[in-house]
Each structure stands twice: as C-alpha cells, then as structure tokens.
C-alpha cells in the first residue's frame, strides 16, 4: 500500500540514489542480497513502500536507474548494495549527454526514454496503490537535468494524479563543474515549475559548508555530501515507512507546504549534525534538535532563510519523544521569530513524529521549509544565465541539437517570474489583500491565453 517509485538519473542522481538505498536498507534490516536480517517487526510492517517482495522472500527496491553512459551504473552495480537492484531496471545508453541539456532532453535522452518508461510502467503495475514518484537528479549536467525533466513530463502525462517529488541538486555559486551549468539549470527549472509537485533543493556548496564547518571534515568528499543528502531523504520519507503518532505522506506534505502551485521549491535541513569526534558530548533533546534544525547554517542549499520569510514549514521528528514537547518547541520558534514567518498564513508550521529513530541516534529531525529566500538561488543562476546568453555564448551546442533560442528566452523569463512571485509574497502583509485579487485576475487571463 502507498508505494513510492524511486528514479535516479545521471551521474549525480545515481550516486545520491545509491547512497539513499544504503541508508534505507540499513533502516529496514535488509542486507545487500535483499534478505531480511533485522530484529524488529516494525522494519517489515511497511517495507513495501520502497520494496517489492520477490517470490523467494528477497526484497527488491522499487528503483529505476537511468543514465546516458554506462560508467556510473557500473560503479553502482559493483558498489556495496549493487546486487540488490533488479537487473532489468538499469537503463543506460552509450553516448553520454556531455553536460548538454538538449542532448538529454531532445536527442540522446529522447531515444532512451521509451525504454525507461517501459520499466516505470512495469514497476507501477507491481504497486498496490502507487502514491507517487521520487526523482534524484542534478540540474547542472545533461542527463539528470535534460533527460530527468523529460521523464518527469512523460510521467506527468501518464500518471497525472500521482505525486511527483524531486531531489534536485542545483549548481553552486562557487563550486562549478561545467561552464554551461546556468543554461542547464534554467532550462530544468522551467520544466520543474510546471511538472513537479515538490522539489527539495540541494546544493553542493551548502553541503560542503556543513561538512566543513559543522562536521569538521577537512577534505569533504562527494561520499560525505551524499551521506547528508541520504539522511535527509530518509527523514522525509520515514513517516511513510514506519508507524508514528503524527504521520504524513507526500500529498499531506504538499497540501501543508504549498500555498501557491508554482512555489514548490523547498529548503531542507537535518539535525543533529555533529562531528564524529564530539557525538558523545552532546545531549539530544527536542529543544536542541529544534534549535539546530531552524539554524540557517543547517540548510542544504545556499540561501539564507533570514533574508526572506517562511510561507510554510514542516518538521519531521524521529525517535521516542513527547508530541506535546514537539508542539511546544515549534510554537516557541514561531513566537520568538515571528517576523520570519508570513502573518497571513496562521499556524504555518506542521510537525510530524515517527517513532523509529535513524541508526545510531536516539532522536533526529528533518526540516522542510518553503521560504521566500530561496529566490536567492534562482536569482544567482539567472544572473549567470543572462551574462552568457546576452553574448549567445555556448548556444551552438544547444541549437545544434535542434533547440531554438526562443526556448532559452522563455525559460529565462519563467525563472525571473518565479523570483518576483517569491518577492511579492515576501513583501505581502495581512492587510493589503485588495491588491492581490487584481493581480490574480491578470494572472488567470494570462493562463488562458
């Protein structure tokens, strides 16, 4: 019941995704061959959200792995949990997308997409009551961004009433892998605004900072970054996988977090984050978790919530704790920092509690915030985009794959619209509702055109 299909695409998506499966397998007591070796009935109670039980009693992840080159998948296959995936669910091409969104979305990716959709259908038919899809990808490359958004739009057509959740790694301000990241990211956001229900925004630089400052790692590797992401991913979905006092699912999450359909890009955080050496000196209490969870240094994307206001937020606590204390702490945060929450959405913080803590911790919490300050990220990418697009730099790589400049202009203006929508609601107060009604009528007229 309530299954989620997991799809990972491109190098980044496959690396994050395989780390996620290591964490989830560990939490459910499933070993790398798919056998159950756990010690608690709770691990198996809702194991079918993410796993299919095969005839011989093995548990197989409901995961689909795709890429336009075989390299990353080979390393997933030879990795610690590589043998647990269904071999048919590895779908890969040979050519690679070469960090080119157009190759992923229109040419190379379009040739492979039907093979991926066949696997998606097969997995969806195996579900009792499919709740939705979660997609792991990056927006800076070619496959995860171009082919990832193509797949999302195709799934949208075929399963319009299912939730679509993405874990999207945005290009970072200082750490850049490729020159054309701003192009790829802007074209992807253009798609995600329309076709995804919820986007968890991640960004390597913020993750580096967490590893460096909070976890005191001198040379953080991608493995360390992905470990942070997988802790968050596991936290977002723990309510679905374990019993809890206040449960939520993907749809409840969306209903509580998204006041306006386009504004579905969330900041995520995780607590407790402690360096390996200092764990034993830390007392874990609900107030301490709450404090760290709302800390701007804890956010996994490079935007500072203090520069904007929270429209809504959701906190998921895990472990044995009193729900009364959780509620008190959350109200406390809102009262002390009321200027950081929009006053025209009362009670805009939802909390849920799941009884099972992650491995090695007595309690933990995952934070998801819909903050207007996320416009900083879009603004930054947009500036880099404009700087290059004004000179038409690197455009021939995209037009050569059949793209039109018009599409770039549309994506650019869609992203700028998104930024100004966030700004509009950041400045809004509870009194000036008259202005809005007019704006909304105008928007409707535009929509119908």
Swiss-Prot record:
Binding site for Mg(2+): 69
MF term (GO), any: metal ion binding
Gene Ontology annotations for the cellular component aspect, listed alphabetically: microtubule; microtubule cytoskeleton; plastid
Keywords from the named record: Cytoplasm, Cytoskeleton, GTP-binding, Magnesium, Metal-binding, Microtubule, Nucleotide-binding
Subunit field text: Dimer of alpha and beta chains. A typical microtubule is a hollow water-filled tube with an outer diameter of 25 nm and an inner diameter of 15 nM. Alpha-beta heterodimers associate head-to-tail to form protofilaments running lengthwise along the microtubule wall with the beta-tubulin subunit facing the microtubule plus end conferring a structural polarity. Microtubules usually have 13 protofilaments but different protofilament numbers can be found in some organisms and specialized cells.
Entry-linked PANTHER family: TUBULIN
Name the UniProt record assigns to this protein: Tubulin beta-6 chain
Lineage of the organism: Eukaryota, Viridiplantae, Streptophyta, Embryophyta, Tracheophyta
Gene from which the chain derives: TUBB6
């Amino acid at each position: 019941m309530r299954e989620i299909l997991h799809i990972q695409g491109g190098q980044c998506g496959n690396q994050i995704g395989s780390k996620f499966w290591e964490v989830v397998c560990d939490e459910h007591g499933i070993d790398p061959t798919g056998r159950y070796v756990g010690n608690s009935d709770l691990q198996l109670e809702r194991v079918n959200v993410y796993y299919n039980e095969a005839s011989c009693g093995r548990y197989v992840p409901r995961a689909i792995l795709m890429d336009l080159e075989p390299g990353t998948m080979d390393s997933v296959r030879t990795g610690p949990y590589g043998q647990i995936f269904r071999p048919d669910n590895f779908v890969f091409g040979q050519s690679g997308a070469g960090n080119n969104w157009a190759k992923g979305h229109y040419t190379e990716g379009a040739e492979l997409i039907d093979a991926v959709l066949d696997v998606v259908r097969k997995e969806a038919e195996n579900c009792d009551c499919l709740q939705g899809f979660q997609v792991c990808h990056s927006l800076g490359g070619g496959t995860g961004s171009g082919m990832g958004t193509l797949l999302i739009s195709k799934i949208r057509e075929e399963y319009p009433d299912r939730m679509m959740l993405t874990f999207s790694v945005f290009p970072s301000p200082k750490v850049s892998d490729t020159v054309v990241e701003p192009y790829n990211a802007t074209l992807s956001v253009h798609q995600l605004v329309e076709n995804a229900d919820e986007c968890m925004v991640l960004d390597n630089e913020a993750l580096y900072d967490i590893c460096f400052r909070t976890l005191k790692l001198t040379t953080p590797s991608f493995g360390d970054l992905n470990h942070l992401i997988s802790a968050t991913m596991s936290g977002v979905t723990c309510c679905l996988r374990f019993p809890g006092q206040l449960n939520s699912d993907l749809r409840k999450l969306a209903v509580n977090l998204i006041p306006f359909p386009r504004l579905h890009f969330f900041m995520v955080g995780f607590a407790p984050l402690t360096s390996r050496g200092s764990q034993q000196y830390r007392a874990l209490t609900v107030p301490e978790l709450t404090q760290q969870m709302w800390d701007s240094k804890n956010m996994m994307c490079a935007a500072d919530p203090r520069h904007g206001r929270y429209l809504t937020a959701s906190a998921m606590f895990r472990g044995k704790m009193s729900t009364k204390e959780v509620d008190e702490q959350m109200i406390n945060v809102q009262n002390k920092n009321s200027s950081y929450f929009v006053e025209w959405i009362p009670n805009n913080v939802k909390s849920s509690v799941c009884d099972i803590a992650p491995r090695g911790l007595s309690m933990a919490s995952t934070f998801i915030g819909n903050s207007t300050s996320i416009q900083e990220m879009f603004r930054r990418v947009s500036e880099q985009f404009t700087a290059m697009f004004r000179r038409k730099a690197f455009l021939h790589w995209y037009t050569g794959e059949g793209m039109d400049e018009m599409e770039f202009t549309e994506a650019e203006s869609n992203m700028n619209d998104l930024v100004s929508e966030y700004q509009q609601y950041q400045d809004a107060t509870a009194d000036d509702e008259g202005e809005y009604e007019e704006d909304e009528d105008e928007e409707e007229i535009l929509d119908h055109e």
